[in-house]
């Protein structure tokens, strides 16, 4: 049912040690053969590459997995469920503008009923047919409603509220990024690996652990925010329902 990968660090790093095994989960070592995508940021600008072909067979993905160096990235391998066919417009990650920033989103799970929810305006209109992209647009609409002064506690609390509402419709693990902060929500299946050594401070997020090491599962319904490889906020899980700014 799709898999997620996210990365945040305090300096540019080559991501091959994680992206290479993640690529194999795109139809090779896991049943996610219906497309892949990688978003990364360079000098504040998002670059997005994706294809509807199986990731483990893709030469383009092999090059990206080997060569990509960045401080911030989101990747996805897809198992087509809703709609149950591959296609470029339905391949994650998705990118839309909100609050004068470009946001990138990828999702693991199924929340098909979200497609029927009414939207409040044209802020974000899906390009494809997936429940994932519809959910993304609803999240961005909520963020915009609380983003007037760009105070993180306000829009993050609104994001958490909408996340919990959408999660009642099914399974809703996701990664979201505005080019500065990596937001990860573990509804029921997400892991993190946090590292701080001579090579820098970094966090790797993945649906399943990709390497040996002290990977830790997210608590159920836990939302975390990372910046420069450091966790700066946490909601849900075993914490209070209001933002815990670290």
Question: Which residues does each PLM region occupy?
Answer:
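Conserved beta-strand-loop-short alpha-helix elements that form
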Residues: 2, 103-113
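Short helix/loop capping segments that flank catalytic or ligand/cofactor-binding pockets
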Residues: 15, 48, 83-85, 113-116, ...
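A conserved acidic, glycine/proline-rich C-terminal tail/linker
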Residues: 191-223
């Amino acid at each position: 049912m799709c898999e997620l990968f996210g990365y945040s660090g305090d300096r540019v790093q080559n991501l091959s040690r994680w992206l290479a095994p993640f690529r194999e989960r795109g139809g090779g070592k896991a049943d996610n053969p219906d497309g892949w995508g990688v978003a990364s940021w360079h000098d504040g600008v998002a670059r997005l590459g994706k294809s509807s072909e199986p990731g483990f067979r893709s030469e383009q993905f092999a090059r990206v997995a080997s060569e990509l160096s960045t401080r911030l990235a989101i990747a996805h391998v897809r198992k087509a469920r809703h709609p149950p066919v591959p296609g470029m417009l339905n391949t994650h990650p998705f990118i839309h503008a909100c609050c004068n920033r470009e946001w990138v989103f990828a999702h693991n799970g199924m929340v098909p009923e979200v497609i029927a929810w009414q939207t409040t305006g044209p802020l974000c209109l899906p390009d494809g047919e997936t429940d994932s992209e519809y959910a993304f647009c609803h999240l961005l609409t909520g963020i915009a409603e609380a983003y007037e002064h760009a105070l993180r506690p306000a829009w993050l609390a609104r994001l958490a509220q909408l996340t919990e509402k959408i999660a009642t419709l099914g399974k809703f693990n996701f990664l979201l990024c505005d080019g500065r902060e990596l937001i990860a929500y573990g509804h029921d299946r997400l892991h993190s690996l946090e590292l701080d050594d001579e090579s820098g401070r970094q966090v790797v997020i993945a649906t399943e652990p990709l390497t040996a090491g002290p990977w830790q599962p997210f608590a159920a319904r836990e939302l975390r925010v990372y910046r420069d490889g450091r966790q700066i906020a946490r909601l849900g899980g075993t914490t209070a329902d209001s933002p815990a700014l670290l």
